[in-house]
């Protein structure tokens, strides 16, 4: 995650022996790998990967959208998810773990301005199905959660910080 103060509060609540926060941008593979490789021994064996990092930027029609926003969504919602999953797959197979990918109903229900975001979530859905097929028989469980509209900070980010628009 990237919300250090919230993660620290959760660690305080759960205890440092039960929760070790890692704060980094999932798009930065070097920083991510250092964080994972530097985990304390008690947290070095991962049983469950929850790919929850994701974002949607902008609400404009495709022809008016900012290409840089599209690239950030693809890098976060697809590239980082695939890269992190691949890095942890050997350990998850060894431990018969679980992978939970956060997709969205936007994967199958298009809406104006949701072009690239919906495309990234369609990828997550299909990637989950492919992983489940590849990992069949290994004991690794793979699932995708595809929520609809949920009142979170996510929509505030999408609308550029406008609580009212979200």
Predicted regions located by residue number:
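Active-site loop immediately N-terminal to the catalytic Tyr-X3-Lys motif
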Residues: 111-115
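Residue(s) in the substrate-gating loop at a strand-loop-helix junction
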Residues: 104
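SDR active-site lid
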Residues: 126, 132-166
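Conserved NAD(P)H cofactor-binding loop of Rossmann-fold oxidoreductase domains
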Residues: 53-58
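Active-site helix of classical SDR
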Residues: 85, 120
């Amino acid at each position: 995650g990237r919300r250090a103060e919230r993660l620290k509060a959760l660690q305080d609540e759960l205890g440092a022996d039960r929760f070790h926060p890692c704060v980094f941008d999932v798009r930065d593979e070097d920083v991510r790998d250092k964080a994972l490789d530097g985990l304390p021994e008690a947290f070095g064996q991962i049983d469950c990967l929850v790919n929850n990092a994701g974002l949607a930027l902008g609400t404009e029609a495709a022809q008016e959208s900012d290409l840089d926003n599209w690239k950030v969504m693809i890098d976060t919602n697809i590239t980082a998810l695939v890269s992190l999953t691949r890095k942890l797959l050997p350990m998850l197979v060894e431990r018969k773990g679980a992978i939970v990918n956060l997709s969205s109903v936007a994967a199958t229900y298009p809406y104006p301005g949701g072009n690239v975001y919906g495309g990234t979530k369609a990828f997550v859905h299909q990637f989950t199905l492919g992983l489940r097929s590849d990992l069949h028989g290994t004991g690794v469980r793979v699932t995708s959660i595809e929520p609809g509209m949920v009142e979170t900070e996510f929509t505030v980010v999408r609308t550029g910080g406008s609580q009212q628009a979200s």
